């Protein structure tokens, strides 16, 4: 709960009074910490899910979550998005076509108290492990473009720079020029916000690639594939299930992406490393 002595710096961060011990000295100082609040998704007046999230770019979050979860297939399927903010949380009032709402409310969700969640609440293992339509993108990038995108992503994380407590996701074109960056306490949320921002800007996600400051979990790979992003690069490792999904969905999955180094786990044809297969790099 926000104390009277705290002041908001920006929606994604707040200032707290802390006791810092460093180099054998202790002092009372002002420190920036990441903001986090419950965000309720309400479709056609019916509550659907509550996510713990950073209270920035919530319109992008509403659209991106709806697309990556398969609630709607196209941005125009969301008729109205209204954001209502309160002292301790926010609600996203979303209107979708009646037939979509009827299908949605058959799905039972249990997302309370989570910082992002990609598969929570599905009613069967089969529903969780569904494979999106296979990606057919002709995208190809080189390792310089990937390194350029990673550098730009690092430079465009103001909340992380202030607090050290959030994830970031970005989308870059084939030359590695980062067009969009979003931050959130939840890695899934950050990617959802990018997906929503792409849709709102009417940018074809298949013409570029996503970079994230987290591991590449199954949920992250699923969201990228569902959004028709053909390549996902993470600075940390993927999971085995994420690799299996990427192989089946036609997604190029890259891990340990740092500077000009990386490991390609699936569909390597989209990344030109500049060396022959088997040649020492």
Swiss-Prot record:
It is found in: Cytoplasm. GO terms for biological process: Mo-molybdopterin cofactor biosynthetic process. Gene3D superfamilies: 3.10.20.10, Cytidine Deaminase, domain 2. GO terms for molecular function: sulfur carrier activity; sulfurtransferase activity. It comes from the Bacteria. Keywords: Cytoplasm, Molybdenum cofactor biosynthesis. GO terms for cellular component: cytoplasm. Disulfide bonds: none annotated. The active site is at 117 (cysteine persulfide intermediate). Required for formate dehydrogenase (FDH) activity. Acts as a sulfur carrier protein that transfers sulfur from IscS to the molybdenum cofactor prior to its insertion into FDH. This is Sulfur carrier protein FdhD. It comes from Xanthomonas axonopodis pv. citri (strain 306). The gene is fdhD.
């Amino acid at each position: 709960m926000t104390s009277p002595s705290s002041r908001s710096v920006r929606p994604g961060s707040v200032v707290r009074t802390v006791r810092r011990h460093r180099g054998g000295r202790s002092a009372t100082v002002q420190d920036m910490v990441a903001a986090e609040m419950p965000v309720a998704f309400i479709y056609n007046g019916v509550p659907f899910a509550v996510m713990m999230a950073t209270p920035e770019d919530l319109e992008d979050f509403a659209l991106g979550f709806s697309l990556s979860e398969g609630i709607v297939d196209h941005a125009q399927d969301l008729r109205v998005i209204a954001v209502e903010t309160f002292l301790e949380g926010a609600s996203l009032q979303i209107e979708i076509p009646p037939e979509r709402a009827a299908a949605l409310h058959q799905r039972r969700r249990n997302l309370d108290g989570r910082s992002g969640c990609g598969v929570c609440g599905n009613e069967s293992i089969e529903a969780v492990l569904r494979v999106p339509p296979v990606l057919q993108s002709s995208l190809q990038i080189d390792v310089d473009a990937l390194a350029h995108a990673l550098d730009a992503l690092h430079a465009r994380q103001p909340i992380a720079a202030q607090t050290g407590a959030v994830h970031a996701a970005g989308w870059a074109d084939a030359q590695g020029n980062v067009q969009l960056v979003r931050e959130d306490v939840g890695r899934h949320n950050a990617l959802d916000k990018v997906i929503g921002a792409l849709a709102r800007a009417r940018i074809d996600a298949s013409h570029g690639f996503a970079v994230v400051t987290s591991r590449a979990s199954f949920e992250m790979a699923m969201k990228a594939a569902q959004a028709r992003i053909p390549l996902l690069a993470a600075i940390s490792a993927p999971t085995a299930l994420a690799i299996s999904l990427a192989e089946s969905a036609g997604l190029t999955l890259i891990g340990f992406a740092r500077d000009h180094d990386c490991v390609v786990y699936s569909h390597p044809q989209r990344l030109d490393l500049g060396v022959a297969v088997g040649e020492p790099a």
